[in-house]
Amino acid sequence: VIDFNPDTAEDTINIFKELITGINPDDLLSIGIFPHAPYTVSDKLYRICKSVSDKFDIIIATHIAETKDEVEFLAGGTGHFVSLLNDFNMLKNWKPPRLSPINYLNNIGFLENGCILIHCNYLSEDEIDLIEKTKSNVVFCPRSHEYFGHEDHPFFILKNRDINIALGTDSLASND
């Protein structure tokens, strides 16, 4: 799910609901909702996605703490994503939450009931505590991580904290 405009969040989620109507999950098919990332999804749409996840008892996942640019975007309202979104006139009424990525998700009610956090490349000790406390799950994408030259992933720190961590592949855009 992608839509950074809070004014169209309801329309976006209605399209999602239409798409899943009539799909009956079974042992071989499950449904999930995946708001993309904090720089492509408004806080309003994140909240609505979480509500849909809870209402329909479906998996919810998002890309989070993937890049230093994302951390800068949320914490200070500066950097690459601000420039990019301004180019598309998408930050009209947006104000930076002035929070780290994980604290941002927690602040909007996303971190609960086993949500899936994709990447988590840049985490503080407090954020790791929060991931553990909320029983959130982490997906580490090693090829994407290597492709973009990120710093060491906190994989073993997460594993040693008994945080559920899985390996993922991310998109073809970040794999050779």
Where do the protein language model's features map onto the residues?
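Active-site-adjacent C-terminal substructures of enzyme catalytic domains
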Residues: 38-41, 107-176
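Metal-coordinating catalytic core of metallo-dependent amide/deamination hydrolases
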Residues: 1-115
